[in-house]
Curated annotation (Swiss-Prot):
Organism the protein comes from: Thermotoga petrophila (strain ATCC BAA-488 / DSM 13995 / JCM 10881 / RKU-1)
Family: Belongs to the polyribonucleotide nucleotidyltransferase family.
This protein's UniProt keywords: Cytoplasm, Magnesium, Metal-binding, Nucleotidyltransferase, RNA-binding, Transferase
Protein name in UniProt: Polyribonucleotide nucleotidyltransferase
Function: Involved in mRNA degradation. Catalyzes the phosphorolysis of single-stranded polyribonucleotides processively in the 3'- to 5'-direction.
PANTHER family, per database record: POLYRIBONUCLEOTIDE NUCLEOTIDYLTRANSFERASE, POLYRIBONUCLEOTIDE NUCLEOTIDYLTRANSFERASE 1, MITOCHONDRIAL
């Protein structure tokens, strides 16, 4: 067993190797502060046939024992990965994926298991460090060292590993990963920060990343691991030369420049089939399937190089646009009669339908994860059905990609929402991607913002998003605005920026190259800002402010406040009072017994108002001398019990009836209404009444109460 220690950011970072998981090809047990994770890396013996990508899987296992908790719910065992675990797995996957050899076809599995969790040291950040180490000490081909860090920005200072208070009161929450040379991955949110501050944050993060990578280099200097060779199939003799001879570059250009996505795909596929047949004929090959993978690979490379060359040399993109040009945009709102808010945002061949549903406070999402407990009142769900790209696939639950895209769009919008005190609704936004050709997550931000305004949610400002790309050649650096799927696939960088007219609210970046300079990143962010302003103008032209009224189909929520000491009166013995209010007025009621905040939800405004009025009446302090009307609930020989408010019952003693009790009882029965005056409230809060007769002059405030 080997162990290494280093103090980083005022915490001890401890790495152990050879103590646990020794049968794994690579493993690392890493402790940073009180967060402990185990990362393991393994590879299959045989390559997977018929694929053209690296078959990498990253799993992030949350174990509730790491936080000293037992899983909630009926089954007390962790099941399928939670949404937070999936997001953490994606966060680890993205910086390591580009570092595998492109021709690797053996299955690789990285598993990060959280064994102990420190709220101030995110396990996914430690997971990036541990996964990098596990891969580097294994026999798996892996070409680099990566690390990650979480960064906050508060009171003009950048903070590595910010506390929850720093995040809440600060302006930024981003996770950054990279190599010793550059930042390669960013994911996070901000409260309308400037582009300059975002670049400074990445520079600050990279200074910490370099220290973490340096520690890994120190550890890895003690290892001399023999990596598995990546076996590349050899193409048949003469195939590469035949492909070069038969490829017509002008014809390939013409097909790449077909403007419509589906037509372009068909044109390129047809030309690939044509080349395959020509090569087979030239080489006298009868087994087309045998040479098809080699031809496809050569063709893919030719398409990539040609698309990039057209952009660099001629400034022309596949759909005919210039590098900074945005596709045509259209926005519509109020599409459906019964939904609470709706919007259709179309940018070129990417289309998102945003639907807003307003729910009651009790419709919140309950959160119970390793690091979080509580509720979530704003949710954004992103759906990417197969028809949006004209494909046929089985419909199952949300994919990791759908969860990740929805999370990014949610972070972009959430800081523009009104506080719960001003708008007590639970808000759900659903984005249905109806058509996709790049940047659907940013289209979701736009459709979500439009739909929120259409629903009458008082968001502070519109939020728009744009996806940017980069073509990096030895003699050129071309930044692309509003990339399509083809440019995302063949480009060197994909970064998404969402924000208002005043700053960035969400940012995501993935780099396929070794990294980009601060100057280039700043240039790209400013180009993205111009695009964002253009899109925001189109959105404000469609709907410039939240609608003044909610949909008539949205639930009505009204809020009142009562003295916390009176909450018990509103609830009543065994919940009798509140249950009666709920039943009588067909409403839902939520009461915070600490603050006395009462929320009443219903479909009828009249009923909600009546319920609120009654709750206020119940919570109102009853004073000695007050004249009230109440119903007789019980008759005893010594007097009558009268309910003057729900749950508030007092005694009208026979001596206070004002006439002979026997005669009076002949005239009264249970359920009758009697006017009484409060003459005493004892130390236990019990009420005593006297009967008020017709024409009697009662002087409010006279008392014999011990309280007064």
């Amino acid at each position: 067993m080997k162990e290494w220690r280093r103090n980083i950011l005022g915490r001890e970072l401890v790495v152990q190797y050879g103590k646990v998981a020794k049968q794994s090809s690579g493993s690392a047990l890493v402790r940073f502060g009180d967060t402990v994770v185990l990362a393991t890396a393994n590879i299959s013996d045989k390559a997977v046939e018929g694929i053209d990508f690296v078959p990498l899987t990253v799993e992030f296992q949350e174990r509730f024992y790491a936080a000293g908790k037992i899983p909630g719910g009926f089954i007390k065992r962790e099941g399928k990965p939670s949404e937070s675990a999936i997001l953490s797995a994606r966060l680890i996957d993205r910086p390591i994926r580009p570092l595998f050899p492109k021709k690797l076809r053996n299955e690789v599995q990285v598993i990060v298991t959280v064994l102990s969790v420190d709220p101030n040291v995110p396990p996914d950040v430690v997971g990036i460090f541990a996964a990098s180490l596990a891969l580097n000490v294994s026999k798996i081909p892996f070409e680099g060292i990566v690390a990650g860090i979480r960064v906050g920005y508060r009171d003009g200072q950048f903070i590595a590993l910010p506390s929850e208070e720093d995040i809440e009161k600060g302006l930024m929450d981003i996770t950054v990963a990279g190599t010793k040379d550059a930042v390669t991955m960013v994911e996070g949110e901000a409260k309308e920060v400037a582009e300059e501050d975002m670049v400074k944050a990445l520079r600050f993060a990279h200074s910490v990343i370099k220290e973490l990578v340096d520690f890994q280099e120190e550890i890895l200097s003690e290892f001399n691991v023999e990596k598995i060779p990546v076996v590349e199939p050899t193409p048949p003799e003469g195939l590469v030369e035949a492909f070069k001879d038969l490829l017509n570059k002008e014809e390939l250009e013409r097909r790449i420049l077909v403007k419509v996505k589906k037509e372009r795909e068909v044109a390129l596929k047809e030309y690939e089939e044509q080349l395959l047949n020509q090569i087979a004929e030239k080489l006298s090959v009868t087994d087309l399937e045998g040479i098809k993978p080699f031809v496809s690979e050569l063709y893919e490379d030719a398409v990539k190089k040609t698309m990039r060359r057209l952009i660099v040399e001629k400034g022309i993109r596949a759909d005919g646009r210039k590098p900074t040009e945005i596709r045509p945009i259209s926005c519509e709102v109020g599409l459906f009669p019964r939904t609470h808010g709706s919007a259709l945002f179309t940018r070129g061949e990417t289309q998102s339908l945003g639907i807003v549903t307003l729910g009651a406070p009790m419709d919140v999402q309950i959160i119970d994860t390793l690091l979080e407990e509580g509720v979530k009142r704003f949710m954004l769900h992103y759906n990417f059905p197969p028809f949006c790209t004209g494909e046929v696939k089985p419909l199952r639950g949300p994919s990791r990609r759908e969860i990740g895209h929805g999370h990014l769009a949610e972070r972009a919008l959430k800081n523009m929402l009104p506080p719960e005190e001003e708008f007590p609704y639970t808000i759900r936004v659903v984005s249905e991607i109806l058509e996709s050709n790049g940047s659907s997550s940013m289209a979701t931000v736009c459709s979500g913002s439009l739909a929120l305004m259409d629903a009458g949610v008082p968001i502070k400002k519109h939020v728009a998003g744009i996806a940017m790309g980069l073509i990096l050649e030895e003699d050129a650096e071309i930044i692309l605005t509003d990339i399509i799927g083809m440019e995302d696939h063949y480009g060197d960088m994909d970064f998404k920026v969402a924000g208002t007219r005043d700053g960035i609210t969400a940012f995501q970046m993935d780099c396929k190259v070794s990294g980009v300079s601060d100057e280039l990143l700043m240039k790209a962010l400013m180009q993205a800002r111009e695009a964002r302003m253009y899109i925001l103008d189109r959105m404000y032209e469609t709907i410039s402010a939240p609608r003044p009224h909610l949909s008539k189909y949205a639930p009505i929520i009204k809020v009142t406040k009562v003295d916390p000491e009176k909450v018990a009166d509103v609830i009543g013995p065994g919940g009798r009072v509140i249950k009666k209010i709920i039943k009588d007025f067909d409403v839902k009621v939520e009461i915070d017994d600490e603050t006395g905040l009462v929320k009443v939800v219903g479909s009828s405004e009249e009923n909600v108002d009546k319920a609120i009025e009654l709750i206020r009446e119940i919570a109102k302090e009853i004073e000695v001398g007050e004249v009230l009307e109440g119903k007789v609930t019980r008759i005893e020989p010594y007097g009558l019990f009268i309910e003057v408010r729900p749950g508030k019952i007092g005694l009208l003693h026979q001596s206070k009836v004002g006439e002979d009790m026997r005669q009076f009882l002949k005239k009264v029965k249970v359920g009758d209404t009697i006017k009484v005056q409060v003459i005493n409230i004892d130390d236990l809060g019990r009420l005593q009444f006297k009967r008020v007769t017709e024409g009697e002059n009662t002087q409010h405030g006279k008392t014999h109460s011990k309280r007064n």
